[in-house]
């Protein structure tokens, strides 16, 4: 069927897109009991099923659970909105044609880390609920949650960095993201264009770890 025949790369990026919907809906400042519950269930389902669906597209249980996760994440962000991950990703898609799910995948751990203490409490709560961390320290649990997202990206060969971003475009892109997000998105911390510019530079960078990974796995996801 259509789900089983999805390429691995599309399975990965659309799944991480759904994860972004759920997390941004949860950590924002305009949540309800219902949207928080939907986000939590979606995140747990994605953590438990996405990599299985990526490895074996014919696993009907994993595919079915990912469909439910995507639906739940959609109901959550429709009411509670998204955040700066989406604002930056939209500008990259509009300017360079970077696929939305791919942009979200790469940006998600970067933006979550950049929120700093403003997001620690809620990310730590998600880390504990989903079993990612048992640390009583919010900063530690939040960091472990973010690292888990990074490890998911790596395990599914989501390419980093995002190619083709030109330095001369970044101020304009940051203004686009700022206009989209402010004041519509109830983000954990308000940023201006200068802070947003940093996000574009961060997705351009290649760490030593990434260079080693790319040399070991030169091929991108199908």
Q: What residues fall within each predicted segment?
A:
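Amphipathic alpha-helical interaction segments
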Residues: 37-41, 45, 65-68, 87-90, ...
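Hydrophobic alpha-helical packing residues
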Residues: 46, 50, 73, 126, ...
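C-terminal catalytic subdomain
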Residues: 80-150
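C-terminal charged capping/lid subdomain of soluble metabolic enzymes
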Residues: 123, 133-222
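Hydrophobic faces of stable alpha-helices that mediate helix-helix packing
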Residues: 16, 20, 40-43, 47, ...
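A ubiquitous short alpha-helical element
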Residues: 7-8, 30-37, 109-111, 134-135, ...
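Carboxylate- and glycine-rich phosphate/diphosphate-binding segment that chelates Mg2+/Mn2+
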Residues: 1-80
């Amino acid at each position: 069927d259509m789900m089983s025949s999805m390429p691995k790369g599309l399975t990965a990026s659309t799944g991480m897109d759904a994860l972004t919907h759920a997390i941004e809906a949860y950590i924002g400042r305009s949540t309800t009991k219902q949207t928080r519950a939907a986000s939590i269930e979606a995140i747990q389902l994605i953590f438990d099923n996405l990599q299985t669906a990526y490895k074996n597209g014919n696993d009907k249980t994993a595919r079915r659970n990912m469909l439910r996760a995507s639906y739940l994440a959609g109901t959550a962000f429709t009411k509670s909105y998204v955040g700066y991950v989406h604002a930056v990703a939209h500008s990259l898609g509009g300017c360079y044609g970077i696929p939305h799910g791919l942009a979200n995948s790469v940006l998600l751990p970067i933006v979550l880390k950049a929120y700093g203490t403003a997001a620690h409490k809620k990310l730590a709560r998600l880390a504990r609920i989903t079993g990612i961390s048992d640390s009583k320290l919010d900063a530690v649990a939040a960091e472990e949650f973010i690292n888990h997202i990074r490890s998911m990206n790596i395990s599914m060969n989501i390419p980093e960095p995002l190619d083709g971003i030109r330095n001369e475009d970044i101020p304009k892109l940051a203004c686009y993201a700022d206009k989209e997000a402010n004041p519509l998105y109830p983000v954990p911390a308000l940023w201006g264009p200068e802070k947003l510019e940093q996000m574009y530079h961060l997705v351009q960078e290649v760490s030593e770890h990434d260079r080693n990974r790319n040399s070991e796995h030169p091929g991108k996801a199908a």
